[in-house]
């Protein structure tokens, strides 16, 4: 039996996690430990972990390779691994868990491996599954490894969202880059405004509290991750330009001779764009979130 045929028939695989010391790398190790039917053995490589395995032996040992490297380095790491794996890649499944998809999927496809691009739309959870979360799935090339990937995706318990890699990047730019940029811009304006956060808290509205909480959530993360999300794809940079243009329009409208005549129709057009159902549901979610910010009563 060939190596490739053997890979399709055995229920378990030898899994290599590239980026095993990172947050999702550690989550993956826990996930495979909780799903032993998927992985006979899991080994990892990470420059931050001196005890991890070097990439060269992993390239010839692994059946399944999962790249969980920092988004700014993913394509380069895939290229280095491909140079080590060479013909062995044709018998392997390569997956990546990164926030952009077109470039990593293309880099993996160039190797000859079977390819699946993944983007969990959440930070690594404390649980060993993704129940209640969305997982974008960008299929690059699957044949022999399709049964294993089906079992893998089922075990995640996530809501699967199949997308073309380029379409993922277009949507992610609006879902992630645009939102992160808006929060960063607000924080930059606040930092330059001359007041401390404690001083602003004394006059804070519930909406300000929610916006500030979102900003603090962003600041609690890895600056390199957010810098990459904002800059690595043309789609993300286009979203930033759209935000700039929208802010410029608002400034011009507010500075105009008749600001209400400019602003009110625009806000009404946004109400029509969103629709009554979305507005009602979003306002209800806002009220629930505000309740969550209130200090507990005695």
Cite the ranges covered by each PLM segment:
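Rossmann-fold dinucleotide-binding core
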Residues: 100-101, 107-172
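Phosphate-coordination loops involved in phosphoryl transfer and adenosine-cofactor binding
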Residues: 12, 91, 132
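ADP-ribose/adenylate-binding Rossmann-like module
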Residues: 85-104
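Short, well-ordered alpha-helices that flank and scaffold nucleotide-derived cofactor binding pockets
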Residues: 30-34, 79, 83, 106-110
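NAD(P)+-binding Rossmann beta1-loop-alpha1 motif at the extreme N-terminus of oxidoreductases
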Residues: 2-60
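An accessory alpha-helical subdomain
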Residues: 164-298
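Rossmann-like NAD(P)-binding element
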Residues: 57-84
């Amino acid at each position: 039996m060939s190596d490739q045929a053997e890979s399709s028939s055995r229920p378990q695989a030898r899994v290599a996690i590239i980026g095993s010391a990172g947050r999702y790398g550690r989550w993956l190790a826990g996930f495979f430990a909780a799903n032993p039917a998927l992985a006979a053995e899991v080994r990892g490589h990470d420059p931050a972990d001196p005890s991890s395995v070097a990439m060269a032996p992993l390239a010839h040992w692994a059946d399944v390779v999962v790249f969980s490297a920092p988004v700014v380095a993913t394509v380069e790491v895939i290229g280095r691994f491909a140079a080590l794996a060479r013909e062995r890649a044709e018998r392997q499944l390569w997956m990546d868990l990164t926030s952009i998809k077109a470039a990593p999927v293309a880099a993996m496809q160039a190797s000859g491996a079977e390819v699946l691009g993944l983007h969990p739309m959440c930070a690594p959870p404390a649980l060993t599954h993704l129940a209640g979360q969305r997982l974008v799935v960008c299929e690059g090339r699957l044949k022999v490894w399709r049964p294993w990937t089906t079992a893998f995706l089922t075990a995640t318990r996530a809501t699967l969202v199949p997308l073309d890699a380029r379409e993922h990047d277009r949507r992610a730019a609006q879902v992630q880059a645009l939102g992160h940029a808006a929060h960063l811009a607000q924080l930059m304006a606040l930092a330059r405004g001359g007041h401390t956060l404690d001083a602003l808290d004394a006059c804070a509205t519930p909406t300000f509290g929610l916006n500030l909480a979102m900003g603090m959530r962003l600041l609690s993360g890895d600056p390199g991750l957010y810098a990459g999300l904002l800059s690595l794809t043309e789609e993300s940079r286009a979203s930033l330009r759209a935000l700039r243009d929208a802010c410029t329009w608002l400034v011009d409208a507010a500075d105009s001779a008749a600001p209400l005549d400019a602003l009110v129709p625009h806000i009404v057009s946004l109400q029509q764009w969103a629709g009554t159902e979305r507005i009602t549901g979003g306002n209800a979610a806002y009220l629930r979130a505000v309740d969550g910010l209130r200090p507990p009563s005695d």
